[in-house]
Regions:
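Cell-wall glycan-active module
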Residues: 1-9, 14-179, 184, 194-333
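Functionally critical loop-and-helix segments that line ligand-binding/catalytic clefts
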Residues: 190
């Protein structure tokens, strides 16, 4: 009886602080709807109907503060653990099959954009396991929740919500039916809505850009994305290297854009591979395993991959998976 009473009191107390309401109840949402009508010519009644189907939780600010200060950040996964998730035999085998089934489209993308087939396939493998896992979360609900909830990136997600609604209108997609990742990323390539609108391409010339079902469009769009971020055709991506203790300060823990060229590093006393020209820009990163660390020399194309996902672990997984895919695919020819 005592436990039941305590549970009831907790429920009542929580209800005071958190109230679930249709998103149209919130002034910030109404302001957004009006802006979409005025700026992009949306039908207000249609937007009101769509937004009314999505509920938001109204949270008391004092409770929000207590909740946020009591949350511990998740420790970053080691490179060894990260790699074990994405660079696997299963993902390699499935990737080779995907490559074989889409060989012509991949060759066309490589010819047009200069991005190797292995890199495109690796990104598709890591993002969605070659389209098998595109996300189960209703995208409109995800974006509204982040755009008008307690997210620290509300402005970013309001822009993505705007792009999502425009994307749905431009491609005759039902906003309430679309599903994606928990961050609002969409389709085979996991483009956020703004990237979908800007970088996605109709690669099979069927007059429709479809990243949900069309592998050719996904292939071309990934290649176009990297090309737009200055992918360098036939250039290197990364090389494992070693630095002595006096050179450790050159290593970046976070993403490092290659700014200094090989000549600069050589003049500082670093032994750079003689096959690398003096004018090639380089950076150094460190990847931590549970018991050790790896130092890598990275080139512009490594940085270009981090424009897809801003994480050194991600870029290195793409690179290493691509190397395994290329080796295995070549052996089947």
């Amino acid at each position: 009886m005592k436990a039941t009473l305590i549970a009831l009191l907790l429920f009542v107390n929580t209800a005071v602080f958190a109230e679930v309401l249709p998103s149209t109840h919130f002034k910030s949402v109404q302001t957004f709807v009006n802006e979409m009508v005025q700026t992009h010519g949306f039908n207000k009644s249609e937007l009101q109907f769509i937004f009314s189907k999505i509920q938001l939780t109204k949270v008391d600010k004092s409770m929000q503060k207590k909740t946020s200060t009591g949350t511990r950040s998740t420790e970053k996964m080691s490179w060894e653990k990260y790699r074990s998730i994405f660079v696997t035999e299963g993902r390699i085998d499935k990737g080779v099959i995907f490559w074989q089934n889409n060989k012509q489209a991949l060759e066309n993308a490589e010819s047009k954009y200069g991005v190797p087939s292995a890199i495109i396939v690796a990104i598709l493998g890591i993002e969605t396991n070659y389209g098998k896992v595109q996300g189960k979360y209703p995208t409109l609900k995800t974006l509204i929740g982040k755009a008008f909830g307690t997210s620290s990136r509300r402005n970013f997600y309001q822009k993505e919500l705007e792009s999502f609604l425009l994307l749905a209108r431009e491609n005759t997609l039902p906003p309430l039916a679309i599903k994606g990742s928990s961050a609002g990323a969409l389709g085979y390539a996991q483009f956020i809505p703004s990237s979908y609108r800007y970088y996605a391409v109709d690669f099979d010339n069927d007059f429709r850009v479809d990243l949900f079902n069309n592998t050719h469009d996904a292939i071309g769009s990934i290649a176009n994305y990297l090309a737009e971020h200055n992918w360098q055709k036939d250039a290197e991506i990364a090389k494992v290297t070693e630095l002595d203790k006096t050179q450790q300060s050159f290593i970046q823990e976070k993403i490092s854009k290659p700014i200094k060229d090989a000549q600069y590093w050589r003049e500082l006393g670093l032994e750079i591979d003689s096959t690398i020209n003096d004018d090639v820009k380089l950076a150094f990163i460190r990847l931590h395993d549970d018991q050790s660390m790896q130092t890598w020399l990275t080139f512009w194309n490594f940085y270009a991959i981090t424009r897809y996902n801003h994480d050194n672990h991600y870029a290195m997984a793409v690179y290493q998976l691509s190397e395994q895919l290329k080796q295995t695919f070549t052996s089947t020819i």
